[in-house]
Design a protein with these regions (language model features):
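Terminal recognition/anchoring or ligand-binding modules at protein termini
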Residues: 195, 210-214
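Polybasic, low-complexity binding patches
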Residues: 67-70, 145-156, 214
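Short gly/acidic/polar-rich coil/turn motifs that serve as flexible hinges in modular proteins
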Residues: 47-49, 194-196
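Ordered, small/hydrophobic-rich secondary-structure cores
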Residues: 1-42, 48-51, 57-62, 67, ...
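Ferredoxin-like iron-sulfur electron-transfer modules
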Residues: 32-45, 77-98, 108-129, 146-150, ...
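Short, structured motif recognition centered on aromatic/hydrophobic residues
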Residues: 13-15, 41-44, 53-55, 139, ...
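Short Fe-S-cluster ligation motifs
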Residues: 2-19, 73-101, 121-145, 154-176
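Iron-sulfur cluster-binding cysteine motifs and their immediate structural context
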Residues: 52-63, 97-114, 131-145, 199-210
Length: 214
């Protein structure tokens, strides 16, 4: 059974490792009935817990809001396709967490060039590996009219250094969160600094606010 993540309103992420209700030892109701719950942990997403990555309740004292604006509107999609002779790269800037993994490949991904993605400047194999390195799911690629965006791997939540939670392996994001157009459901990044304008997803704002694990 794969884990799930539930972003609680104005509160932490609840990582549910086992959604099967399990009896809690040494706990009962007032009539002596056994009490059970799912197995999970609360992960900080306000950015100010003194016990990161775990929630310590600080969100309630700092006035953390899980909304992005007064209307709590989802981010506007910015998906574009960059067509090459052998491979097409799809990119949604609105989903990007600005991890900068893609620009390590300066041949096909060059922020100083226009267009900044040119699939014909590198090999198909290299471009595929670059797309796979994108943690946010903003990048995907098509070959022969078939789009590829997901990978096969075990579910995992990784606490990146001074950055977001990196989700891989198809961990289900519960609730009404809106994924961007073309975004991967298998891998994505969740805001940990509390300042993203696209909550619950990371938009790179942790760089602007100088978020740290300490």
């Amino acid at each position: 059974m794969k884990p799930k993540i539930l972003p609680l309103p104005n509160g932490p992420y609840y990582l549910i490792n086992d959604s099967t209700r399990t009896r809690v030892p040494n706990l009962q109701g007032n009539n002596g009935e056994p009490l059970s719950t799912v197995v999970g942990i609360a992960l900080c997403r306000c950015g100010q817990s003194k016990n990161k990555p775990f929630c310590d309740g600080t969100h309630s004292t700092v006035g953390f809001s899980s909304k992005n604006n007064d209307n709590d509107q989802p981010v506007v999609n910015k998906r574009k396709s960059y067509v090459g002779s052998k491979i097409t790269v799809h990119d949604n800037r609105a989903v990007c967490a600005h991890a900068k993994e893609c620009v390590k490949n300066r041949l096909a991904f060059d922020l100083s060039a226009r267009p900044w993605i040119n699939p014909d400047k590198d090999t198909v194999e290299s471009i595929i590996e670059t797309v796979k390195s994108c943690p946010s799911g903003a990048l995907s690629y098509s070959i022969g009219g078939v789009e590829y965006r997901d990978q096969t791997r075990e579910p995992m939540v990784t606490v990146s250094k001074n950055g977001p939670y990196v989700i891989t392996g198809g961990v289900e994001l519960m609730g009404d969160s809106v994924f961007g157009e073309g975004a991967s459901l298998e891998h994505y990044t969740l805001c940990r600094c509390g300042a993203s304008k696209n909550k619950p997803f990371c938009d790179g704002t942790h760089f602007e606010v100088n978020f740290t694990d300490s």
